[in-house]
Structure formats: structure tokens, C-alpha cells
């Protein structure tokens, strides 16, 4: 019989809270939490005759009381609180009985005598004021005696500021745009009107590039990942999936935009018109793709297979697709590999035959050397046939069938000539002219030394 699995009991604190009022507590819960165990009773009875001070000996945590544990033979550390530095006291001087009690705060100012005489000054009588009766305004001549006019003229040709198409030689009298004609006190500026080129007009489209390397107007947008492993692939054969996909999910006819995501609200139990669209709560916007030689209309859907208590719906993603039409592969026109032979007239058919009297037997040809691949082709044609239009391989003693029809000119390969065998060279004598010569060391026959091996004890060692 299998042993029952032991379940852990709740903590004593949790049991004490629930079973105290009901009176169903185990016998060890209440004495432990109310400090009424046998050890607590011994400490209570022993404390009547023994005083332990503030050590805090009991069933609680051993913290040593408020003062903590102090090692034997040492004094406790004393913390000295310095606090804020004291300010020096204000010394108050006592006032004697003979001194006045009124303290003068402001010193006496000097007394001014209002009846004093005016001071007398010695010397000149001051500035002299001169008056005039002339009413004409004063005119000051500030113009110098000699008038000088300065005119600056400059002419330059700089291709950086002038377009190459309109570069011309400077004309007579052409000056720059800054001419100053002035005197010592006044001046006037001369200028030249230059037409300005308009870079932007009000009638533009607003899409003109504003930099040297503008971004392209159309950017590639990443398409939906329809064929991932997380999506269930379902093929829909009903053509209503292209225009009215909502009719396959529910029977009612909601107003919706076929280019946007469709959200469905279903009751707890419902049966869709198409069983492939069971538990579908959302159909995303359509997408046109090309896969496996067909044009495919696709929509991603989301099922609501499970529903949690919080109201969240959990389900798989489904890829619904409908193949519209197959993509026909492009047909390429085949061209002949060899060009057609040049004929005298168009659509001319002629016969080709071989003359056996002109041919020579194949035995007259030299045999091909062994070890190489040699193809010998013998061709013959009648005198009435165009030269080089047709080649017919012939062999001695075998009839070659000849057919009628247009000829194709093959590439001309030059044939190999007759092979003449070369006689092997015979060894001949070598004559050396001269008085002094040296032989190579490899041709010098040195005498070989024979190593002597002793086979007797008297010779010093024994052969192994």
C-alpha cells in the first residue's frame, strides 16, 4: 500500500490567528506564542530570587537588552557629543550712579552763524562777455583748394563665377559693379543691374530635391511574412473571398472597407458559413503575391480558440489565400545555331550525290599515330553542286544514303596533312679538340674501398 504523502502544516502564527477564537488550536501553539512554555515558567520562577539586570535573558532573540553585551574586563565606549561651538558672551558694562542715563547717539554738529559777512575775493573781475550785433550766419569753407576725382576700374574673367557657355571677351568700357566717384567730403555709388536666375518657382510640385543625393521617391516596404511556421496555411476556393470576405465568417452584412482590417464580434456559440473560418475574430488587409507560378490573393486571420478569465483571447494565426490565375512562362523564339547557306535563289532545293570515280581508297592515306584521336572525313560532290554547301562522309565499300533538302554550311576546319615519319638519330662519335679539358666529378671512376670485417677474437671484436 503506498504511503500517504505528508502535507506541511501552516506556520504557528497563521494557526494562532484562526484557531484562537474557535478554540481548535493544537496544544503547542498557544503556549509558544503566549510565552507560557515550561522554559518560560522556569525563568519566571527563577527571576524572583535572581536579578539578571538588563541582559534580556528569555525566549526572545538574544540581543543583550538595550545596552548590549559588554566584554568582561573592558569599559564601555563613551560617545562625546561636541555639538555647536559656543559663542563668546556679550559683555555689558555697568553704568554708575553719577553718569547720566541718556546716551548721545549723534555727535554735535558745528553751529553756522547766519549773520556772517560774505568773503571778499581779490584779483581780476572774471570773464569778459562780448556781444555782437551781426545777424548774418557764419559760413565755413571746408572745401579744399584743389578738387580730385578718383575712378577705379577693374575687369576680370573668372570661370568659377561665369558659365562656360556665355564666356565672352570683355568689351571696351566694361567695368566692375563698384565704381566710386567721390571728393574729399562727398561721394556717389554706381551700380550695374544683373539679372538673377530663379531656382525655385511657385508652380513647382514641391518634390524637388534639396540635396545633391536625394532619397528615392519609392521605398521598398517589407511585406508580411505569410509563409512562416507560425501561420496555418488554408486555401480558399470561394471567389467571394476576394470582394466580400466577411460573408464567409458571419451571416450579417456589416459595412466595412475591404482594404482595412475587419474585426468580428461573435456570440459564444456560432457556426460560420465556411467551416475554414471558424473562430476567426480578425482578418487583416489583403496582399497580392506571386508564388509557384500563380498570382495569389492573401489575408492573415486570427482565431480566438481560448479565452482567459481576464477576457484575453488566445488563438493561432491563419494565412488564407486564393489563387487568381497562373503566370504563363515567357516563350522565347529559338534561333538556329548555324547560319543558313547562301543560295542563288530563294527556296531552291537540289540533290547531292557522290562520284565513286573521283574518290580514292582510304588505304592510300597515312595511318594516324597511336595515342591520338584523329577523325578523317572524306567529302565529294558533283560538279553541278555548289562548292562547300554539303559534306557527306564516305567509307570504302559502303553505300552512303543521300537525301534531298536544304543544306547547312558547317564551320570549315582545316584538315591535317600527311604525316611523314622521322628516322631515329644514330649515335655518333664525339671529337674533342684542344689540349686541356676537365671531366665532371660524376664521370670519374674512383676505386671502391672494401671494408674489412674481423671474424676472430684476436682481431679485437666478434662480428654480430
Swiss-Prot record:
Pfam families associated with the record: Late_protein_L2
GO molecular function: DNA binding; structural molecule activity
Family in the record: Belongs to the papillomaviridae L2 protein family.
Function: Minor protein of the capsid that localizes along the inner surface of the virion, within the central cavities beneath the L1 pentamers. Plays a role in capsid stabilization through interaction with the major capsid protein L1. Once the virion enters the host cell, L2 escorts the genomic DNA into the nucleus by promoting escape from the endosomal compartments and traffic through the host Golgi network.
Segments passing through the bilayer: none
Post-translational modification as stated in the protein's UniProt record: Highly phosphorylated.
The keyword Nucleotide-binding belongs to this UniProt entry's keyword annotation: no
InterPro entries in the cross-refs: Late_L2 (IPR000784)
BP-aspect Gene Ontology terms: microtubule-dependent intracellular transport of viral material towards nucleus; symbiont entry into host cell; viral penetration into host nucleus
Key words of the record: Capsid protein, Cytoplasmic inwards viral transport, Disulfide bond, DNA-binding, Host endosome, Host Golgi apparatus, Host nucleus, Host-virus interaction, Late protein, Microtubular inwards viral transport, Phosphoprotein, Viral penetration into host nucleus, Virion, Virus entry into host cell
S-S bonds: 19-25
A GO CC term assigned to this protein in UniProt: host cell
Name of the featured protein: Minor capsid protein L2
Compartment list: Virion; Host nucleus; Host early endosome; Host Golgi apparatus
Biological source species: Human papillomavirus 27
Location (main, coarse): virion
Sequence motif Nuclear localization signal, residues: 1-10, 445-453
Subunit details: Interacts with major capsid protein L1. Interacts with E2; this interaction inhibits E2 transcriptional activity but not the DNA replication function E2. Interacts with host GADD45GIP1. Interacts with host HSPA8; this interaction is required for L2 nuclear translocation. Interacts with host importins KPNB2 and KPNB3. Forms a complex with importin alpha2-beta1 heterodimers via interaction with the importin alpha2 adapter. Interacts with host DYNLT1; this interaction is essential for virus intracellular transport during entry.
Amino acid at each position: 500500500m503506498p504511503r500517504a504523502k505528508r502535507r506541511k502544516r501552516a506556520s504557528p502564527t497563521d494557526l494562532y490567528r484562526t484557531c484562537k477564537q474557535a478554540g481548535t488550536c493544537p496544544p503547542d501553539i498557544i503556549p509558544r506564542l503566549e510565552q507560557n512554555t515550561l522554559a518560560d515558567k522556569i525563568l519566571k520562577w527563577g527571576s524572583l530570587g535572581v536579578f539578571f539586570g538588563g541582559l534580556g535573558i528569555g525566549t526572545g532573540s538574544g540581543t543583550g537588552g538595550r545596552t548590549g553585551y559588554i566584554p568582561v574586563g573592558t569599559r564601555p565606549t563613551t560617545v562625546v557629543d561636541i555639538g555647536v561651538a559656543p559663542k563668546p558672551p556679550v559683555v555689558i558694562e555697568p553704568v554708575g550712579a553719577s553718569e547720566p542715563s541718556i546716551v548721545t547717539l549723534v555727535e554735535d554738529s558745528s553751529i553756522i552763524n547766519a549773520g556772517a559777512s560774505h568773503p571778499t575775493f581779490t584779483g581780476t573781475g572774471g570773464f569778459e562777455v562780448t556781444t555782437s550785433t551781426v545777424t548774418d550766419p557764419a559760413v565755413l569753407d571746408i572745401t579744399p583748394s584743389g578738387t580730385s576725382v578718383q575712378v577705379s576700374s577693374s575687369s576680370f574673367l573668372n570661370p568659377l563665377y561665369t558659365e562656360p557657355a556665355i564666356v565672352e571677351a570683355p568689351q571696351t568700357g566694361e567695368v566692375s559693379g563698384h565704381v566710386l566717384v567721390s571728393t574729399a567730403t562727398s561721394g556717389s555709388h554706381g551700380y550695374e543691374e544683373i539679372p538673377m536666375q530663379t531656382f525655385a518657382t511657385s508652380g513647382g510640385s514641391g518634390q524637388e530635391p534639396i540635396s545633391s543625393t536625394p532619397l528615392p521617391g519609392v521605398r521598398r516596404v517589407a511585406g508580411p511574412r505569410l509563409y512562416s511556421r507560425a501561420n496555418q496555411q488554408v486555401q480558399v476556393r470561394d471567389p467571394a473571398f476576394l470582394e466580400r470576405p466577411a460573408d464567409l465568417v458571419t451571416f450579417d452584412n456589416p459595412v466595412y472597407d475591404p482594404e482595412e482590417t475587419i474585426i468580428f464580434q461573435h456570440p459564444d456559440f456560432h457556426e460560420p458559413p465556411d467551416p475554414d473560418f471558424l473562430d476567426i475574430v480578425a482578418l487583416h488587409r489583403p496582399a497580392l503575391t506571386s508564388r509557384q507560378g500563380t498570382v495569389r490573393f492573401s489575408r492573415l486571420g486570427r482565431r480566438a480558440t481560448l479565452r482567459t478569465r481576464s477576457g484575453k483571447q488566445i488563438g493561432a494565426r491563419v494565412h488564407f489565400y486564393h489563387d487568381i490565375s497562373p503566370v504563363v512562362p515567357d516563350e522565347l523564339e529559338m534561333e538556329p545555331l548555324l547560319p543558313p547557306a547562301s543560295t542563288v535563289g530563294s527556296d531552291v532545293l537540289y540533290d547531292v550525290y557522290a562520284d565513286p570515280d573521283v574518290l580514292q581508297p582510304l588505304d592510300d592515306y597515312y595511318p594516324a599515330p597511336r595515342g591520338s584521336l584523329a577523325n578523317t572525313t572524306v567529302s565529294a560532290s558533283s560538279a553541278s553542286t555548289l562548292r562547300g554547301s554539303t559534306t557527306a562522309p564516305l567509307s570504302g565499300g559502303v553505300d552512303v544514303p543521300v537525301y534531298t533538302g536544304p543544306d547547312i554550311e558547317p564551320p570549315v576546319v582545316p584538315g591535317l596533312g600527311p604525316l611523314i615519319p622521322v628516322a631515329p638519330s644514330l649515335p655518333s662519335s664525339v671529337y674533342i679538340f684542344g689540349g686541356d679539358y676537365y671531366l665532371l666529378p660524376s664521370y670519374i671512376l674512383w676505386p671502391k674501398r672494401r671494408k674489412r670485417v674481423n671474424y676472430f677474437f684476436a682481431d679485437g671484436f666478434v662480428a654480430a
